[in-house]
Amino acid sequence: YRQNAQGEKEAVEWTAQYAEDGTTWTDTKPVWLTAFTASGTGGEFAQPCDATVEAQTGISNDLHENALKAATAKGSETTPYNLSNNTGGNTVENTANCYVVNAPGYYSLPLVYGNAIKNSATNASAYTSTVTGTNILNPFINHAGNGITDPYISGNGCTPAKAELVWQDAMNLVTDIKYNADSNGGNISFKVDRSSIRQGNAVIAIKDVSDAILWSWHVWVTDEDINNVIEITNHQNVKYNFMPVNLGQCDGNTITYEERSCKVKFIAGDQSKEITIKQLANVIATGSNAPFYQWGRKDPLYPSNGMGNTTKIWYDKEGIPSTANPMKGTFSAGNDCIKNCILNPNLMHNRYNGDYTYYNLWSADNKTTSANDNPVNKTIYDPCPVGFKLPASNAFTGFTTTGESVSSSTQVNGTWSSSEKGWYFYTNSEKTQSIFFPALGYRSYSTMRPGSIGTQGCFWSAHPVAKGNNYYLRTSSVDVQPTYMVDRGFGYALRPCQD
């Protein structure tokens, strides 16, 4: 404002100009300055001047990201690429709880429980069992605790209404998530944009009108050829074909966000004042990481950042970033634990012994508690993509000279890499090939926090030791336990084998 000759205060209108280079003034604000109060009527009292800036797309020289960006796009907005079909066609051929995306594009997935459709037909063996007993779940249950009788969610008295993101660990990795009503309950479609594609994980859920989650799926974006399997021979001379990386694996990466600044000049009459709006530079670095899983559950939990005992940055459905650990879920044993884990894929239950009931959650016909090489019958709770399943409890025994736990590196069939923080295990007695198992640590069921990142590796098998404990591979730089036993409440990594 100004005072006139009579001493009265008069409002003076003001406008703003911008100089992104600091010297050249213009009336047009920078494109990244998405909102700004650029003018006002003036007056005796201060007025708010608001500014918002557009989110940056970080700069990365990551080879995996570059390969994904260069890949030929799949599908279109009107005809998304069907992830349950080998060529993206309309027919539902093979389903899973995890779908792998390796290129930008538009995608869809059918509303089917896990692997309940195989080779274009109902796969009832994925949700029923041929064995009986108090520790056998039969049939498998859905979010309501009801036995599943049909592969399609809509065929079990459920009415899908909307789809939404639960979380993702790369910004704008999966967008435009939609529920599309159609036959067999419809499908979910989504977009993976070329500008933001990179290695990452997302969980997408289908909900009913009351906002209850009916089921959810893991979308893993990677350029890794997961079908380039590595054959290993265990101590019992049984062969397994392992995926070359962990489920949901993301390699270490550094993303740089450059500083942005702009001078703003406020002009009122013949006077002016200048300010500088500045968005500071930032660097986000991660080490090798992969999601954690509680035994018997289908949904991934947030990875660590791969560099310490800290959760990797993840984004909620509003795009808000966080490094918070999973929220705690306190459930009863048995079916209550299972159905509540389906309803709450973002929660980590704090029961040290998990459901504390069933032997067959990851192998439908299993009733055995001793370590073995029995065939694993993949279930609708198996987290693996099409063509893969969790390994039997003896799968890792070839990694030591005895087939059992050893506490000396001289008894390990492999070499420890201190730079990569993991074991290169020999895949056979000739030692002509190796397979890498990184020390990705674990997530605690009591604190919900990641631990032992870079020093310990933990990988679930499909088989239980008892109703609350399970076999897993445990590694450190000096010891390896191929059939170690632990409470099923822990969050561990997964190394799938070929189905």
Functional labels for PLM-detected ranges:
Residues 212-217:
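Extracellular and select intracellular beta-sandwich modules with Ser/Thr-enriched
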Residues 183-199:
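Extracellular/luminal low-complexity segments enriched in Ser/Thr/Pro
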Residues 333, 339-499:
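C-terminal, surface-exposed recognition/capping segments
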Residues 218-227:
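Short beta-strand edge segments in extracellular beta-sheet folds
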Residues 178-186, 233-237, 417-419, 429-430, ...:
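Short, ordered beta-strand-loop transition motifs
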Residues 1-176, 230-270:
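Solvent-exposed, low-complexity, repeat-rich "mucin-like" stalks and linkers
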Residues 198-209:
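A short beta-strand micro-motif common to beta-rich folds, especially ectodomain repeats
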Residues 232-358:
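Conserved, compact domain cores that house catalytic/ligand-binding motifs in diverse enzymes
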